Design a protein with these regions (language model features):
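Conserved beta-propeller blade signature
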Residues: 55-58, 99-101, 155-157, 198-201, ...
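Short, solvent-exposed loop/turn segments at conserved positions within beta-propeller repeat blades
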Residues: 61-62, 109-114, 160-162, 246-247
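A short loop-to-beta-strand structural motif that recurs across blades of beta-propeller domains
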Residues: 65-67, 116-119, 163-167, 207-209, ...
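Beta-strand-rich domains and repeat architectures in extracellular enzymes and scaffolds
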Residues: 38-64
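Short, aromatic-rich amphipathic segments at membrane interfaces
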Residues: 298-326
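Surface loop/turn motifs at the tips and blade-to-blade linkers of beta-strand repeat domains
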Residues: 36-43, 80-84, 132-141, 178-183, ...
Length: 412
């Protein structure tokens, strides 16, 4: 009786260990092939921004992953796209509480926009809610949400309407319309200063304006006066408006105080970097951050720090090591039960059965060795091929965007 009870306890313990192991593997499945001792390399950066604590938020992997990087340059967490969260994030900001807000765009039929929304994540990257949703017109390929600015406990987002630009504050639950003429057809991106209630916008024909109540908006920058200039994303912070210039491959800096309005200067990177990469986006609140297809650039005045990868935080390293250990235990347990079963079959059945089992065992062993040897290479090739195709797609989209801007410039 005591021997039987001992077996039952062993069975219960093994069952609990199996359930715990399966839970750990399922919870960490997205980190299964991440080496905890190597830096996490960006695959295709779409956007980056900073917060007041020095942390950086990066949209990576073709808009499907959000990364939070600590002030000392370590990866804290990663949130992945899903039907229960976001599908394709195009902008990211963090409020004073550490909550993260995403501009989520849902695409259908290749390039047509089905809907847009503002998705709220917790400071740990967990989905909380969708705080705003905008249905797109059928067949539309242009975004209606054209900017986001973080607040202490929420976010302000700008949305194109027939009447102009609708500025909504989720913290206060308020909204206001700025009557910009032909906003839906003209405006590419907006920035907003909450302190002065000022709206800035860049148009498809390469001009940057500040909204005025007079109906004649103030022209701050005209790309027609600068050969090759194509201003793209804009962002405002502390009296200065910044714009990513995808034509000249630098950052336009426009002081917006009374004394310096209309003057501009530029933040530029080394020529070798200009030849390889373009800073498509810039975000000023918190920390001035720009991003290229491959990297993130943190600015400090004229100086900058560029990085393509980040080491994992200590917590993530421990979690990954635990995940690998659990996987090793599961593999060992499966092999143990397989060997035990094989021994039982060998003892119980005939020589023919023994021979068959031996052959099957050899085949399984060879297959396991083959898969274990070639799978990492196959995974690497698959990732590289997917990455190359995505880069080609992004490059094609950017070229199309540039052509559209140029054509719009001619039209206006």
């Amino acid at each position: 009786m005591e021997h039987k009870r001992k077996k039952q306890w062993i069975l219960i313990i093994m069952l609990l260990l199996t359930v715990c192991s399966v839970f750990v593997v399922y919870a960490g499945r997205e980190w299964m092939f991440t080496n905890p001792f190597k830096p996490y390399t960006f695959s295709s950066v779409s956007y980056a921004s900073g917060d007041g604590d020095g942390c950086t938020y990066v949209i990576d992997d073709s808009n499907r992953k959000i990364l939070k990087i600590s002030a000392d340059g370590r990866l804290l967490w990663r949130a992945c796209a899903s039907d229960k969260s976001f599908l394709s994030a195009e902008r990211v900001v963090a409020d004073g509480d550490g909550n993260v807000y995403l501009h989520d765009v849902r695409i259908e039929q290749g390039v047509q926009i089905a809907s847009e929304g503002i998705v709220k994540l917790s400071s740990k990257g967990k989905y909380i809610s969708t705080v705003a949703s905008v249905e797109a017109e059928k067949g539309s390929v242009r975004r209606n949400i054209v900017g986001m600015v973080p607040t202490e406990h929420g976010v302000v987002y700008m949305q194109k309407e027939k009447e102009g630009i609708l500025v909504s504050n989720t913290e206060q639950g308020s909204s206001k319309v700025f009557s910009v003429a032909d906003a839906q057809d003209r405006i590419l991106c907006c920035a907003y200063d909450r302190d002065s209630d000022s709206l800035f916008y860049v148009t498809y024909d390469g001009k940057i304006y500040k909204y005025t109540d007079s109906g004649q908006d103030e022209l701050l920058y005209d790309s027609d006066t600068v050969d090759g200039s194509i201003p793209q994303e804009i962002s405002y912070s502390d009296g200065v408006l910044y714009s990513a210039d995808i034509g000249l491959r630098d950052i336009i800096r426009i002081p917006c105080d009374m004394e310096n309005t209309g003057s501009t200067d530029r933040l530029t990177v080394e020529e070798s970097l200009k030849e390889r990469e373009i800073a498509y986006h810039v975000s000023a609140p918190g920390t001035l951050v720009s991003s290229t297809n491959y990297s993130v650039i943190l600015w400090d005045g004229e100086d900058y720090e560029q990085f393509w990868d980040v080491p994992l935080s200590g917590k993530l390293q421990v979690w990954n090591c635990l995940l690998w250990a659990v996987c090793a235990v599961i593999v060992a347990a499966v092999l143990f039960f397989a060997v035990t079963l094989l021994k039982i079959l060998v003892k119980k059945f005939s020589f023919y059965a023994k021979t068959t089992m031996a052959v099957i065992g050899i085949i399984v062993g060879v297959a396991a060795l083959f898969i274990g040897t070639l799978f990492p290479q196959f995974q690497s090739l698959l990732v590289d091929e997917t990455y190359k195709r995505e880069i080609c797609r992004i490059s094609s989209n950017k070229q199309t965007s540039c052509r559209c801007i140029s054509e719009a410039g001619k039209a206006f």
